[in-house]
Amino acid sequence: MNRSHQLLSVLAIIFYGVMVVGSMMQFLAYYELTSLPSVRQVSLMLVGICAVVCFYASIVYFVEISSRG
């Protein structure tokens, strides 16, 4: 495997993690102001689903690049 491809995939995983954490913080800050527990639970569920999807996409991306290189 090429080292630049490995570095690129690691950076992509870090980027996805930062995006997920940032969006979770935005959801929490917004729904703390509205203070609706049902909306907060739904938003947390949606953020969790997005986190799982982004993590799975980064793993698929990493495997695809490592199989190419």
UniProtKB/Swiss-Prot annotation:
Which keywords does UniProt give here? Host membrane, Membrane, Transmembrane, Transmembrane helix
Is the keyword Transmembrane helix assigned to this protein? yes
Q: Which residue ranges does UniProt annotate as crossing the membrane?
A: 7-27, 42-62
| Topological relation to the membrane, as annotated | Multi-pass membrane protein
GO cellular component terms, A-Z: host cell membrane; membrane
| Coiled-coil annotated spans | none
Please state where this protein is localized. Host membrane
User: What superkingdom does the record give?
Assistant: Viruses
What is the protein named?
Answer: Putative transmembrane protein ORF34
Organism field: His1 virus (isolate Australia/Victoria)
